């Protein structure tokens, strides 16, 4: 279970399904002997949400916009019902590009050298 929380612009929190946390962020918290390793205010390299019937609309209409405002580098929405992945990637000009994947191999920018077979994400 993911208990990491990402602080939003209004001071509340979201708990993504999966998040890649930079090593430097974890090390900084350890150096400060912080007891709170699960709250991050800075932009994350990769945030993943899994679409569900109960929260799918909220994930796309609200959380996606907040992740983009934070400047998260790559945001994925896995849609298990139609077996697709929508990826938003932050570009140098500050805008996000959107790509929809239905098959093949995905290479997350946040994890150089990692290749993920899309079909494997939807195996039971």
Residue ranges and their predicted role:
Residues 2-70, 77-124:
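C-terminal interaction segment
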